[in-house]
Design a protein with these regions (language model features):
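Carbohydrate-recognition beta-sandwich/jelly-roll modules
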Residues: 1-180
């Protein structure tokens, strides 16, 4: 489904799941939004739940990009660490010394792909970049809170954002991390 309102366009992906022994289907909705005039895609998720059910943890979003030739990853460990994109998994728990800010950047000479969360509360999460010979999958593992459920619907209380700039990692971080 495509939603077009006064300030943004949103793709809504809906899955219907059977979660208990009833014939009732429970929708899970993923929203990918581009605000009018915006540069970053915003990702969010919500799910309707049976009475008394909780979401205890989730991995969201899982954004897969082509692994850039001669690519490197920037994590926010300490004052920032840049590493080659080896075939490995990079993980960093936020907030901690291993992830002092809420983003990862994959870059090479062609530009920078920015992945971050706009979580003003600073909730715990583990940033992950899983590298294969051809792809990089960026995601967050999130321990969920019962407080994120209202009227039987779980909703992640922040958006994750993605964007690309040909101007490099410094442009991505200065332009997109600071404003939120």
């Amino acid at each position: 489904q495509v939603r077009d309102d006064a300030r943004a366009k949103t793709l809504v992906f809906t899955w219907e799941l059977t979660l208990d022994y009833s014939p009732v289907k429970y929708p899970v909705r993923m929203y990918v939004t581009l605000p009018d005039g915006g540069e970053l895609l915003q990702w969010n998720i919500e799910a309707d739940l049976p009475a008394g059910w909780l979401v205890t943890d989730l991995k969201f979003p899982n954004v897969v990009i082509e692994r850039p030739e001669d690519g490197r990853i920037i994590t926010t460990e300490g004052w920032g660490v840049e590493k080659p994109l080896d075939i490995a998994t990079f993980e960093a728990r936020y907030p901690s010394h291993a992830s002092a800010m809420q983003f990862l950047v994959v870059h090479n000479a062609e530009g920078a792909f920015y992945y971050g969360t706009e979580d003003r509360r600073g909730c715990g999460k583990t940033y992950s970049a899983q590298c294969t010979p051809t792809t990089v999958a960026l995601s967050d593992a999130i321990p969920a809170s019962a407080g994120w459920i209202a009227d039987g619907t779980f909703r992640l209380p922040w958006v994750s954002v993605t964007g690309f700039t040909p101007k490099g990692w410094e442009d991505a971080v200065v332009r997109w991390y600071r404003p939120f």
